[in-house]
């Protein structure tokens, strides 16, 4: 899908760049595949802010997207592509041969009327088809990749995202992630062929603060403009640099400080994303 620019009738319209969604379905989602979604405003069950700068925004309905793709060897037809306010990618409504319907992440170059299938065996390498990594040809681009067999896709699910299968080793697949990390994943984990739709998402410009508010994003206030009671960088006479290495409001180093401590999965990372690109 292309990008849309607007006549500069106001400063906001001059800067506004959005994705042209004219090719998407304009009606309501399938009711049996939706759930209610209450706005949390960044608060937990005690009513305390656990995520700053969230709140407000347009009311949403949650679409139940099938990340597991466990309906094996039943061909599905793409009914339509839809907008989903809960994610950056578009979603596709699939109607299976037995009449069941499901939403899946829409890959690039998938259109209404196309056929898709998921299997625990090898299937055609075409966008939307899902199969275990052990059957995917080396060099292929995939998305919605499982990290644990049967858990459902966790990697490469946002707009334009993909992972490349670069090799195999002793029942494991070697994946190159978009961060540059190379990672081992078990060959029985499912992946869907292709890259995720809406790759133009990275080029949009909201044009005005209000459009961020419609999305439920509140102003992101910098620590250096706060008072000392509110942030370690706060206070000082006039504009200051913060006076120390950047820290979070709770005094923890931020902006590049490594926090990964999951030793149990270290063995699956063949190449760190921090290693210099050769």
Curated annotation (Swiss-Prot):
Region (Disordered): 201-278
Assigned keywords, A-Z: Ribonucleoprotein, Ribosomal protein, RNA-binding, rRNA-binding
Cited SMART domains: Ribosomal_L2 (SM01383), Ribosomal_L2_C (SM01382)
Alphabetized NCBIfam families for the sequence: rplB_bact
GO BP, sorted A to Z: cytoplasmic translation
Task of the protein: One of the primary rRNA binding proteins. Required for association of the 30S and 50S subunits to form the 70S ribosome, for tRNA binding and peptide bond formation. It has been suggested to have peptidyltransferase activity; this is somewhat controversial. Makes several contacts with the 16S rRNA in the 70S ribosome.
Family note: Belongs to the universal ribosomal protein uL2 family.
Subunit structure: Part of the 50S ribosomal subunit. Forms a bridge to the 30S subunit in the 70S ribosome.
PROSITE patterns: RIBOSOMAL_L2
A GO-annotated cellular component: large ribosomal subunit
Keyword Ribonucleoprotein carried by entry: yes
Molecular function, one GO term: rRNA binding
Protein name: Large ribosomal subunit protein uL2
Lineage: Bacteria, Pseudomonadati, Pseudomonadota, Alphaproteobacteria, Hyphomicrobiales
Chain intervals with Basic residues compositional bias: 210-221
